[in-house]
Structure formats: structure tokens, C-alpha cells
Amino acid sequence: MTNKNAYAQSGVDVEAGYEVVERIKKHVARTERLGVMGALGGFGGMFDLTKLDVKEPVLVSGTDGVGTKLMLAIQYDKHDTIGQDCVAMCVNDIIAAGAEPLYFLDYIATGKNEPAKLEQVVAGVAEGCVQAGCGLIGGETAEMPGMYGEDDYDLAGFAVGIAEKYQIIDGSKVKEGDILLGLASSGIHSNGYSLVRRVFADVSGDALLPELNGRALKDVLLEPTRIYVQQVLPLVKAGLVNGIAHITGGGFIENVPRMFADNLAAEIEEDKIPVLPIFTALEKYGKIKHEEMFEIFNMGIGLVLAVSPDKVDSVCQLVDEEVYTIGRIIAKEDKSVVIK
């Protein structure tokens, strides 16, 4: 073993790593926004907060991955949207606190650097950043042979946003009588996939299940998580929203109560939720109890807003899509979420 190729013989291809960096530069460039400083490749990403017109700035951060949805991306060899999922999981969490996403960093760990595949992953991250209006200012791609199989990789991200202190959404403004408005999800999003994979373990990704309206199963399962920043940020800045819940792991039951005080509860009208076909299929083929579906999945609503009754019309006018009135805030008697 010579010094020149010792690292390569141990399973780490430095040249492939350099190629990945070159390939992703054009995708990172798409995400440039006001405040981003420096170029890709520095030791740290930089952002100039003085460029922003914020009088009492509060930084809000979030980090997340995409769970075992990543295993389906690997199984179906489709890597161009999983990065958007990662961005969505982070920025949707910080917009729930009323923060505008500023910048994002990603972390990819893999058993073998495959430049073309990793470029697809980062292209998806960049697309998510464009949709969220945040800059992709850094990241890490770690080649770890022995830790991961050659075809395997993991993906995580970290987002930082900013809000005016008085506009922070922390649950303190939600009150009894507030109306619950829902924004539609694009699909399963990025939670519950260990169950999803079990339910469809013996079904081909190309299968055309009757419930899915002609779409291949793999396309439905890998539908990227929706990013809500463009719809919700104007509502926050206009002071129209009292609370926001991002419906992730734990479904309605775990996430909706995170946006209000312990003495309140959410009363949700099930028939007002636009249940997506994939959830009907999951319940049917997985033989999942109907009430349990609301403890796991978003069921067709990815974001829930708590809004004062006199501001509902303004919210609906400002959001350029259908808004679903799915319930209201009530005084808590027993459960934190009551589904009628």
C-alpha cells in the first residue's frame, strides 16, 4: 500500500468528494439571498444580519432528518426530492414559531461517494431552500465505509430563521374560541414511514392501487413534503395568526396541542379534513384503526393555524389556496384533542 492511495484503499475516495463539491456549486448558487456572505467551501457559513430590517431580532433554529422515507428513496433509486423533504421538516418547524428562514446547512453521510447521486440529493436541498427563501450556506458530506453500506446514505439538516420579538408565536396568544384552519399537505410528508414500509413491504413501487387514482405507489410515497413558508410568513407579519402547528410525527394528537396552553383543547371536525387517497389506502391495507391514523399521520392537513374569528376572512383572502376550517379551540375537559 502506497501513501498515494492508502486512503482510497481504505474505502474513502477523496477525488469523488471533490467532484461532489464541484457538481453542487450551481445548485447552491440558486439559493443565494440577502445576507448570505462568502462562497461555498469555507470553514463556516456566514450570514450578515445587519442587512435585515428587524428591530428586536430573535433567532429560531430547527434540525431534522427525513426518517426512513430515505430508505424508500434508496430502494427506488430516486434521490432528487428527498433533500426537499429535509428542508421542509426544518423550515416548517421554525415558521411555526413565526420565524422567516434565513439559512440552511445539510449533512450527508454515506458509505461511498457517488457524485451523480449526491448531486441529486443536494439539488433537492437547494430546491427546498429556494421554496423557503433561505440560503444554503454550508454542509458536510462524510464518506464512512464500514459505517454505511455502499448504496446507503443518511441526510439531516439545520435551519436558522429570524423573527421580530413581538411576532414570536409561542402558544401564549391562542385562546378559547379561536378557529382552526388547515393548509393541505402534499402527501404523507416525512413521518410514519416505518409503518408505511411495513404496510407496503410486498407491494411493487410501480403498483397502481385503485385508491391512488392512477399514480404509481412509489411516486405517491416519495411525494416531497410541502413547504409552507410562502403561505404563512405574510400571515405572521400581518399579525393574523395566534398559533401554528406543524403536523409531523404523532399526527394531530401530538402536534396540535403544542401550540396552546394546557388548559385548552382542540375540537376537530373530521369531516372537514380533505383526507388524501394514500391515507385511505394505508388504513385499508395496513388494517390500522381509524382513530390511530390521527395519532400517526397528517391525514391531508400539514399545517394547522389558530386564528381569531374576526381574522379568518383576512387569512383566507391572503392565502392563495383553499383553506379548510377544521375546528376550534375549546376549554379542556379531558383530552387535548377531540376529534368529532
Swiss-Prot record:
Family: Belongs to the AIR synthase family.
Listed GO MF terms: ATP binding; phosphoribosylamine-glycine ligase activity; phosphoribosylformylglycinamidine cyclo-ligase activity
One cellular component (GO) term of this entry: cytosol
NCBIfam families (UniProt xref): purM
Pfam family, one: AIRS_C
Species annotation: Streptococcus suis
Keywords attached to this entry: ATP-binding, Cytoplasm, Ligase, Nucleotide-binding, Purine biosynthesis
Keyword Cytoplasm on entry: yes
EC number: 6.3.3.1
Pathway: Purine metabolism; IMP biosynthesis via de novo pathway; 5-amino-1-(5-phospho-D-ribosyl)imidazole from N(2)-formyl-N(1)-(5-phospho-D-ribosyl)glycinamide: step 2/2
Record-linked SUPFAM superfamilies: PurM C-terminal domain-like, PurM N-terminal domain-like
Enzyme class, first EC level, given as a word: ligase
Main location: cytoplasm
Protein name: Phosphoribosylformylglycinamidine cyclo-ligase
